[in-house]
Amino acid sequence: MQGQEDGDSILPFAKCSRVVSRFSPCSLPPQNRRPMPQPYGDAFWENLSQRSSSNWMVEQYIPPILRATDCSRPSLHPLEGLPPPEKLWRRKRKKLHLERMQKGPGSIPARVRAVTYHLEDLRRRQGIINELKRAQWGSSDATPELPALEEGFELLSTTKYFDVEEERATYPQKETYSVTPRDQLLWTPWTPVGQQGTYASGQLSSLTYSTATARKNPVYDPQAMELESEE
């Protein structure tokens, strides 16, 4: 008995358990069925019908801002179908940007304004280039002096070149040329006795040209080599 009592104290729920049965709504007893309470009773409808309806034709004042945005009509756009404010603001900003690009400020097309800005930028850059030229070369009218060549050579202007040619034509100078034996073999100068003075300059110029070309482009000639060996 003592062990049984100890067991009962240890496991009280095994002895105190109850059987639970659930009844379907159809099998409920008739006294449990109660009429559903109506939200609007007869008194509500009677008061509604007795209320004066003289102000139904008076239009309710709606601010113009709410009229423009259709905020006064909550049934027009339900809350479930509206996009979030971020998307609405993003679309609005994009639309405004496109309108500005198409129209431009001051009712000027955006392409025309872009072209004018580009031309102004080109004029500004050209002005900077002209200022740098004036700072480097002096005035814009004066032509810049050409730098002198290295090793003491100078560039002759056109007027100086023509002056030198005229002096050579009026005062012919006797030029001496040293002719090597190889040059004599390539070309032997011959002048008649009476026309030595008149053909001297032309023959000497042709002599220098032939010797220069012969030195630049030497041609292998076995007969000339034999003559050089005999000499």
From Swiss-Prot:
Sequence intervals crossing the membrane: none
Q: What induces it?
A: By serum starvation.
Keywords linked to the UniProt accession: Cell cycle, Cytoplasm, Nucleus, Phosphoprotein, Protein kinase inhibitor
Q: Name one GO molecular function term.
A: cyclin binding
Subcellular compartments? Nucleus; Cytoplasm
PTM comment: the record says: Phosphorylated when part of a complex with CCNA1 and CDK2.
Q: Where is this region: Interaction with CCNA1 and CCNA1/CDK2 complex?
A: 75-99
Residues annotated as carrying Phosphothreonine in the record are T180
Look up the domain of life of the source. Answer: Eukaryota
| Example GO BP | apoptotic signaling pathway
Q: What does gene deletion cause?
A: Mice show increased CDK2 activity in spleen with disruption of the splenic architecture.
What is the role of the protein in this entry?
Binds to CDK2-bound cyclins and inhibits the kinase activity of CDK2; binding to cyclins is critical for its function as CDK inhibitor. Inhibits cell growth and proliferation and may play a role in cell cycle control. Required for ING5-mediated regulation of S-phase progression, enhancement of Fas-induced apoptosis and inhibition of cell growth.
Quaternary structure and partners: Interacts with CCNA1. Identified in a complex with CCNA1 and CDK2. Interacts with ZNF16; the interaction inhibits INCA1 activity and induces the cell cycle process. Interacts with SPACA9. Interacts with CCNA2, CCNB1 and CCNE1. Interacts with the CCNA1/CDK2 complex. Interacts with ING5, DAZAP2, RNF26, USP15, SPOUT1, DPH7, TRIM26 and RAB5C.
Q: Which family does it belong to?
A: Belongs to the INCA family.
Please give the PANTHER family that the UniProt record associates with this protein: PROTEIN INCA1
Q: What is this protein called?
A: Protein INCA1
> Native species of this protein?
Mus musculus (Mouse)
